[in-house]
Curated annotation (Swiss-Prot):
<keyword id="KW-0408">Iron</keyword>
<dbReference type="Pfam" id="PF02649">
    <property type="entry name" value="GCHY-1"/>
</dbReference>
<feature type="site" description="May be catalytically important">
    <location>
        <position position="157"/>
    </location>
</feature>
<dbReference type="InterPro" id="IPR022840">
    <property type="entry name" value="GTP_cyclohydrolase_MptA"/>
</dbReference>
<comment type="function">
    <text>Converts GTP to 7,8-dihydro-D-neopterin 2',3'-cyclic phosphate, the first intermediate in the biosynthesis of coenzyme methanopterin. Involved in archaeosine (G(+)) and folate biosynthesis.</text>
</comment>
<feature type="region of interest" description="Disordered">
    <location>
        <begin position="282"/>
        <end position="308"/>
    </location>
</feature>
<dbReference type="GO" id="GO:0046656">
    <property type="term" value="P:folic acid biosynthetic process"/>
</dbReference>
<dbReference type="GO" id="GO:2001118">
    <property type="term" value="P:tetrahydromethanopterin biosynthetic process"/>
</dbReference>
<dbReference type="GO" id="GO:0044682">
    <property type="term" value="F:GTP cyclohydrolase IV activity"/>
</dbReference>
<keyword id="KW-0289">Folate biosynthesis</keyword>
<keyword id="KW-0479">Metal-binding</keyword>
<comment type="similarity">
    <text>Belongs to the GTP cyclohydrolase IV family.</text>
</comment>
<keyword id="KW-0378">Hydrolase</keyword>
<dbReference type="GO" id="GO:0005506">
    <property type="term" value="F:iron ion binding"/>
</dbReference>
<protein>
    <recommendedName>
        <fullName>GTP cyclohydrolase MptA</fullName>
        <ecNumber>3.5.4.39</ecNumber>
    </recommendedName>
</protein>
<comment type="subunit">
    <text>Homodimer.</text>
</comment>
<comment type="pathway">
    <text>Cofactor biosynthesis; 5,6,7,8-tetrahydromethanopterin biosynthesis.</text>
</comment>
Length: 308
């Protein structure tokens, strides 16, 4: 005689508190991104998938739910997709439809993207990487999608550089160099300052697909720092990076503000309700701590601030 196993997850919990996110993390899938006239871009992606849980239900049927989640992701990644954020949106909507007790489904994805480029001075072919960030949240009211990336660059501290310039000015004055020549020299030869490896993150979230080019967001994030960095660097390239970084010294706060300004120019086709999340974290070279700044803001509010 067979026995039907009890559905413990559907029972009432001892503490009837609802949960905003229950699901799985670390789900790895191969993702193919279609490209017009080119071979598909294949990414090794890692997903996080969550639904909300009402207070009257003990659990989400984790074992069965994992099968549902796997089926949803497999269906989403097996169909041609041109945008990873749309794929996340499709997965979130499928997940929401399969859970009668949930009101919100969230799917997020990260993956390494290899970018081919040339070194700035020697013109040699090289590669860099960016971490793609994509997510979607589906509710009965619709689906919001997010796309962006985290990139690495170089920053130079303006305060440290200012102290070096002051010392250089004093030495040149002691050598009887006239003030005009000193200022011209300091203007043409940026003085040393302590540098950091910077991590810039930029994402855009809208109702439905953001209709934003991922490579534009990557360029904005890289250009918001003092200088771009490259894996391959001959001596002319090292000189180029070092000079331009010191000629464009920025605090961590400056990087986020540069991201805001560049984003406003590139995203002028989006509505005021689009949300931009900008984040900068710098690995300090002369401290054991790191520097951090960020801002999450609607494009409408950002437009008001920069137009003021």
């Amino acid at each position: 005689m067979s026995h039907q196993l009890p559905d413990v997850q559907a029972s009432q919990p001892d503490v009837t508190v609802g949960l905003s996110q229950v699901g799985v993390t670390g789900v790895e899938k191969l993702v193919k991104i279609a490209r017009d006239g080119k071979r598909p871009l294949v990414l090794m992606a890692e997903f996080e998938v969550f639904v909300d849980l009402p207070g009257g239900r003990k659990g989400i049927d984790m074992s069965r739910n994992m099968q549902v989640i796997d089926e949803v992701l497999e269906a989403a990644v097996s169909e041609p997709a041109y945008r990873v954020e749309d794929m996340c949106g499709d997965a979130a909507e499928r997940l929401l439809a399969k859970h009668e007790y949930t009101t919100t489904a969230e799917v997020s994805m990260t993956a390494e993207l290899v970018v081919r480029e040339d070194t700035p001075a020697s013109g040699l072919s090289t590669q860099s990487t960016a971490e793609i960030i994509a997510s979607a949240t589906a509710t009965d009211e619709g689906t919001r999608e997010e796309i962006g990336a985290e990139v690495v660059g170089m920053t130079v501290c303006p305060c440290s550089q200012g102290m070096s310039a002051s010392r250089a000015r004093d030495v040149l004055q002691d050598l009887a160099v006239d003030d005009d020549t000193i200022e011209e020299f300091l203007d043409k030869v940026p003085q040393p300052g302590h540098s950091q490896r910077g991590h810039a993150t930029l994402t855009v979230e809208t109702q439905g697909s953001p209709e934003v080019d991922l490579m534009d967001l990557i360029d904005i994030a890289r250009d918001s720092m003092s200088a771009r960095i490259y894996n391959l660097a001959k001596r002319p390239d090292e000189d180029h990076m070092t000079y331009h970084a010191h000629a464009n010294a920025k605090f961590v706060e400056d990087c986020v503000r540069s991201m805001a300004e560049l984003s406003l120019e590139a995203l002028d086709h989006l509505g005021d309700d689009a949300v931009v999340h900008m984040k900068q974290s710098n690995d300090e070279s002369i401290h054991q701590h790191n520097a951090h700044a960020e801002r999450e803001v609607t494009l409408g509010q950002l437009r008001d601030e920069l137009d003021a």
